[in-house]
Regions:
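C-terminal catalytic domain of Rieske-type non-heme iron oxygenases
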Residues: 2-176
Length: 176
């Protein structure tokens, strides 16, 4: 994922143990074999966003969908609040939401490669997890992203976004 995780608290836990519940949850979507297919996009694979908010608000916003109808009415038209479900991981590790309405983008007759072991009955599922305290991850049948938050002040945050796709053709090909 091109991210280094550091625990600065005295409650040290091995990262493999920390991430295991999320790995188990997502094993229904992607297995270890599929994880080997993830490729970072070279052209638009990394970018920053400056946000006028406290970083904790950005995490909260990412974890829930109740704000969609009022804050994101256009998004709510294609991904209605009723199509979302809540995800609660182990306390103080991760939480988020899932959707049952993901549609793969298609350009002409081409689309990004999909994870080969993703269950066919779950092709429209996507999940959005906040890995506490400041990492957010999105998992889709055809791409994966990670972004981490850098608090700049009490009301300013920089979001660092990393994009990954399945195979080099999707990540860096000319067609998409």
């Amino acid at each position: 994922m091109d991210i280094v995780f550091i625990n600065i608290n005295s409650n040290e836990i091995d990262f493999d143990d920390y991430i295991k519940p999320l790995e188990q949850r997502w094993s229904k979507f992607i297995n270890k074999e599929d994880q080997e297919l993830i490729v970072h996009s070279n052209d638009h694979g990394y970018f920053n966003l400056s946000v006028d908010c406290n970083w904790k608000f950005a995490i909260e916003n990412y974890c829930e969908s109740y704000h969609l109808p009022t804050i994101h009415p256009e998004l709510n038209k294609v991904s209605n609040i009723n199509d979302h479900y809540h995800i609660q991981g182990l306390p103080n590790r991760f939480a988020g939401q899932g959707s049952k309405k993901y549609e793969q983008p298609i350009k002409g007759n081409k689309k990004f490669n999909s994870f080969p072991n993703w269950e066919k009955c779950m092709l429209k599922n996507s999940e959005y997890i906040a890995l506490f305290p400041n990492v957010m991850i999105g998992l889709h049948v055809d791409h994966f992203y990670v972004f981490w938050l850098e608090p700049l002040s009490v009301n300013k945050t920089k979001e660092h976004m990393q994009m990954y796709y399945i195979g080099n053709d999707s990540a860096n090909g000319e067609d998409l």
